[in-house]
């Protein structure tokens, strides 16, 4: 949310033609993070003497591939809408890019943060898999709202609601993986992060590709990406059955 707000203020003040300057400013953050990490203690995920699962051992487990799929779909479900929210707001509401950025990505980010805040505060009282199931269903509904509701303002509300629905997907999948695969360790979390990043790039790419193939109809692009929350929902149900067995 801060990135969207600060970037919008910067472009409004100095003009979008100075985007390279803003890129350099934002580049300072990962540089500082790298310096901090150099001096930060990193503790092992295993008890002393324990050995985590190897990548080969992880790849031999069916549940690992299920959570990998879930992680990919979590990233794709989130970014398929958030990356196109500004364009959707501009085209649907016929507003400037400044207003589009505030109405689209910022509303999405606020509600996504709210979902994570609520779970962080009340997580001990909430069943994670049930919360993720309802969130996935809400995500599907928001996608359908974006694709089919003819009123631009309501479709934009669907974008914001989508932000709330995807808030738990990424951290929730990490938690499910940790509980389902004992001894997964660093290798597991690294591969899950890779899967999530692939989803973050694949979701918007699919939406954009489908949109351009049907006459730049962004609604149809978003509709095509509905496959991701549906697959995530299926993955959650598989994890539930696996836990019972």
What are these regions (language model features)?
Residues 167-181:
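Intracellular juxtamembrane helix-capping segments at the cytosolic ends
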Residues 5-16, 89-90, 122-123, 178, ...:
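Interfacial helix-cap and linker-helix signal at transmembrane-aqueous boundaries
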Residues 181-216:
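A late C-terminal transmembrane helix in Major Facilitator Superfamily
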Residues 130-145:
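Structural signature of the two symmetry-related core transmembrane helices
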Residues 61-113:
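Extracytoplasmic gate region of multi-pass secondary transporters
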Residues 34-41, 223-245:
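Multi-pass alpha-helical transporter architecture, strongest
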Residues 1-42:
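Helix-loop-helix hairpin linking two adjacent transmembrane segments in secondary transporters
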Residues 142, 153-161:
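Paired small-residue
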């Amino acid at each position: 949310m801060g990135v969207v707000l600060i970037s919008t203020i910067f472009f409004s003040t100095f003009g979008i033609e100075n985007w390279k300057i803003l890129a350099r400013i934002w580049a300072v953050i990962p540089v500082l993070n790298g310096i901090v990490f150099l001096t930060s203690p990193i503790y092992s995920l295993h008890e002393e003497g324990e050995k985590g699962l190897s990548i080969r051992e992880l790849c031999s487990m069916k549940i690992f591939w299920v959570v990998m799929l879930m992680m990919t779909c979590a990233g794709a479900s989130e970014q398929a809408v958030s990356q196109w929210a500004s364009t959707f707001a501009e085209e649907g509401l016929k507003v400037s890019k400044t207003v589009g950025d505030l109405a689209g990505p910022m509303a999405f980010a606020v509600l996504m943060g709210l979902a994570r805040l609520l779970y962080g505060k009340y997580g001990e009282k909430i069943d994670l898999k049930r919360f993720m199931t309802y969130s996935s269903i809400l995500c599907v509904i928001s996608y359908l709202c974006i694709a089919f509701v003819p009123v631009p303002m309501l479709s934009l509300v669907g974008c914001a609601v989508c932000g709330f629905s995807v808030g738990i997907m990424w951290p929730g999948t990490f938690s499910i993986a940790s509980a389902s695969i004992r001894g997964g360790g660093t290798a597991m979390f690294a591969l899950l992060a890779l899967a999530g990043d692939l989803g973050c790039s694949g979701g918007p790419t699919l939406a954009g590709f489908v949109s351009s193939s049907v006459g730049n109809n962004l609604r149809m692009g978003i509709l095509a990406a509905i496959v991701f929350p549906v697959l995530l929902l299926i993955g959650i149900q598989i994890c539930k059955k696996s836990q019972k067995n």
